[in-house]
Amino acid sequence: MQVYADNAATTAMSRTAIDAMLPYLDNIYGNPSSLHSVGQRAKEALDAARETVAQCLGCEPREIIFTSGGSEADNQAIISAARYGEKKGKKHIITTACEHHAVLHTLAKLEKEGFEVTYLDVRKGHNVTAQQVKDAIRPDTCLVTTMYANNEIGSILPIAEIGAVCKEAGVPFHTDAVQAVGHLHINVKEQNIDMLSLSGHKFHGPKGVGALYVRRGFPLVNIIEGGAQERGKRAGTENIPGICGMAAALKEACDHMDENMPRVAAMRDRLIEGLSKIPHSALNGDPVNRLPGNVSFCFEGIEGESLLLLLDMKGVCASSGSACTSGSLDPSHVLLAIGRVHDVAHGSLRLSLSEYNTDEEIDHILKVVPEVVQYLRNMSPVWRDLQTGKRQYIL
């Protein structure tokens, strides 16, 4: 049995998304900017997809800008707010310590330009509060940008409350909702969200396509110069097949959310209950306000990379919070931000589920993970030191 439990990294494309793309990979190949009939057929598809995405987010179609994915959307949102604030003498930004690198790296570049960034502490409850945001806002704050839900530890932030704080203070609010869209009910107007980023491949759509919701009237800055596509806010011929596939996948996800997500959450809870029985383990992330499919654990005395490789050999595709799999020896910045020490953060495991997973697959994971953890501990000098008292247990 092979179990795919890495849906926070990417999801399998749905049949609905594939079918929606096929006509635009075949005979409807026109450029939507062209005036002839072939181009106009593509434009009709583009307009319909924009309408679909807008309906799912609770906004107007003209407030949707199609992008190449969540990273581009994050960059454009943050840079736009920064440039707008700069013109008014405001160069202070608020974020959290556990954001995606698309946000953190963009903010780091702005810091080099003289912007000041406040990184909110997430150690308490592995989350932030609206009060933390309120306390951090200053007269020169030009943006609050927080994840909607964390890709690694699954914590869902109090977005509506943060949005209300920002609205009252007159500060633009952007949320990276890449992990939330298609999995949680979202209404950007009711939640006072000014900008929101999403990515198609996180909800069974294609890779390489995403969108940025921008509240009508907000001064968006181009980060790609060229033609006048996307109301002049994002140059480049639109990826019609990808956009149509993403819109179809999002509609399907939203239409079946109330049916699918409780079942996914039930599988998540089974995993959390079962893995919590492994000695010297700890759940990462908010235990209550949590994505339906996210399970994140740290196991003391093992290395995450070894855990992943052995799980893969036993048919479980998962991921680790440790960045060692990308060539770095440093543990995840998210795990460090919530207070995990280096040795513990290195022994992390993230299992992320979708509606395509089954109860039988959960049974397999619950059988395999404890076996692999014990196997690795039996070989670990760190674990031996813990058992003999040369080191002190942390978990």
Where are these regions (language model features)?
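Pyridoxal 5′-phosphate
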Residues: 1-395
